[in-house]
Amino acid sequence: MDAHIASGTFRLGFIGMSNAGKSYRSRKLSEEKGFLWYQVDEEIQKAFGFSDRGQISGWLGLPAAPEYPEREKKYLELENECTRHASMRTDGKNFVFDTTGSVPHLEPETLDILRQNCLLVHLDVGEGKLERMMEKFFEKPKPVAWCGHFFVRPNESQNEALRRCYPELLKTRLAKYRELAHLTIPAQDVFDTSADETLAVIRSYLRE
């Protein structure tokens, strides 16, 4: 790791739940250590011609909407393209890859390329945080890529289906992040840390 950092060839990818700290850690590495920060969300936003991520959410909508399946398909195709492209980038400097929450649902070939070209660090929020994430979602449901994890049963309302399916989506993603990552680090271990402190934590887990 240190040899790669010194030669400007270190390639780090953060994966994990929304609000786990992926973007904050990436920004710190960019500002304090000069890493090239690649934000998949931002690249998707640009490709769609939206001015902010809120517009992506508004366009994608909730899963019961008739236009949702086709829009989700377009979103995931673009995410897959951006992720695969960035995984193979070489820009002559250290690189931090800020992935989306839906990254484990991408094509297996793309995930293989990502794993082969980056040290994937999962910022793990832990099962204990899932309940709060569910509460926040139901306070103000926001569009997400459901990736086949949403369906409405007979005589079930959309809200009831969301309440049944969303916890399963989170649990599935958490398991997939852990399976995909080279290292799983509790998100709290790098909470509010500097770039050097973040790298030191990653280094300590590599030595275990």
Where are the model-predicted features located?
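A glycine- and Lys/Arg-enriched "phosphate-lid" helix/loop adjacent to the NTP-binding pocket
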Residues: 117-173
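NTP-dependent small-molecule kinase module
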Residues: 1-9, 28, 32, 160, ...
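Pre-Walker A (Motif I) flank of P-loop NTPase domains
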Residues: 7-12, 92-93
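ATP-dependent small-molecule kinase phosphotransfer cores
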Residues: 42-112
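Post-Walker A helix-loop "phosphate-sensing" segment adjacent to the P-loop in P-loop NTPases
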Residues: 31-40
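Walker A/P-loop
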Residues: 23
